[in-house]
Curated annotation (Swiss-Prot):
Free-text comment on the cofactor: Binds 1 Mg(2+) ion.
Cofactor: Mg(2+)
Record-linked InterPro entries: 4-PPantetheinyl_Trfase_dom, 4-PPantetheinyl_Trfase_dom_sf, AASDHPPT_N, P-Pant_transferase_sf
Signal peptide from the UniProt entry: none
Keywords for the protein's UniProt record, in alphabetical order: Cytoplasm, Magnesium, Metal-binding, Phosphoprotein, Transferase
Protein name stated in the entry: L-aminoadipate-semialdehyde dehydrogenase-phosphopantetheinyl transferase
Length: 309
């Protein structure tokens, strides 16, 4: 008896992935937008179509395309076979019945300001957040800080207010905020977590654009959490990105820096363009010209602070 040969899909060893896409500068053509929407699941098309503002729709679209690109290229799952779901907290995840060679495979996305960003790891728990430094929409910076007083510890406020100029204070505010959000997204608890339970000891205070640093330490309820590592970077002059990393079993891992590890690492963000996003894409639905017509009538305004995919 002759048995048919089995087909094996070889998956190369996967390393951590860090991608960013400038949705703020992306002005999609009709062809690009219609191709993009044909390349995502119908329920996500419906969700994106409900956004009132173009910039929100573009950021959400970029996030979905980055996730599908990640799964297609790193897990070797054909684009049109990828099934994404959402947890009860709304976090995008790969469907449990998907063929995945990495049981602990984890990814997370964030979009705010001018960028959508993605972090993925084959073995580590991961959370990511991006924040753009910008002046408050209403009131002065001191008034804004007063409103947000309960979000940070006294020590964190000392660090934030330790700089003379208000713009640098805002920089430090959003850097701290990105760190806290990255942790909360990594553990998947969503709203309701008391942010003052978290305290970050920032190091170094100044970050160079394009470098990645891992010296910042986390204290939870006053105790240092040594099993967590935090990658910090600046994509450009105004955007901070924080990536929280932890082994699923909570043990210390190699990405946690030693006490004398003061040099930046080289796991930098790769800036993708639209052609990169759809390089592996397979259209899954018929073309829908009305989706472009609706998009053209939306206004282009900044994403609201805190908007996440």
């Amino acid at each position: 008896m002759v048995f048919p040969a089995k087909r094996f899909c070889l998956v190369p060893s996967m390393e951590g992935v860090r991608w960013a896409f400038s949705c703020g500068t992306w002005l999609p053509s009709r062809a690009e937008w219609l191709l993009a929407v044909r390349s995502i699941q119908p329920e996500e098309k419906e969700r994106i179509g409900q956004f009132v503002f173009a910039r929100d729709a573009k950021a959400a679209m970029a996030g979905r395309l980055m996730i599908r690109k990640l799964v297609a290229e790193k897990l070797n799952i054909p684009w049109n076979h990828i099934r994404l779901q959402r947890t009860a907290k709304g976090k995008p995840v790969l469907a449990k019945d998907s063929s995945n060679p990495y049981p602990n495979f984890n990814f997370n996305i964030s979009h705010q300001g001018d960028y959508a960003v993605l972090a993925a790891e084959p073995e580590l728990q991961v959370g990511i957040d991006i924040m753009k430094t910008s002046f408050p929409g209403r009131g002065s910076i001191p008034e804004f800080f007063h409103i947000m007083k309960r979000k940070f510890t006294n020590k964190e406020w000392e660090t934030i207010r330790g700089f003379k100029d208000e713009w640098t204070q805002l920089d430090m505010f959003y850097r701290n905020w990105a760190l806290k959000e990255s942790f909360i997204k990594a553990i998947g608890v969503g709203l309701g977590f008391e942010l003052q339970r978290l305290e970050f000891d920032l190091s170094p205070l100044n970050l160079d654009i394009g470098q990645v640093y891992k010296e910042t330490r986390l204290f939870l309820d006053g105790e240092e959490e040594k099993e967590w590592a935090f990658e910090e970077s600046k994509i450009d002059e105004h955007h901070f990105v924080a990536v929280a990393l932890r082994k699923p079993d909570g043990s210390r891992h190699q990405d946690v820096p030693s006490q004398d590890d003061s040099k930046p690492t080289q796991r930098q963000f790769t800036i993708l363009n639209f052609n990169d996003l759809i390089s592996s894409a397979v259209p899954m639905t018929p073309e829908d010209p009305s989706f472009w017509d609706c998009f053209c009538f939306t206004e282009e305004i900044p994403i609201r602070n805190g908007t996440k995919s």
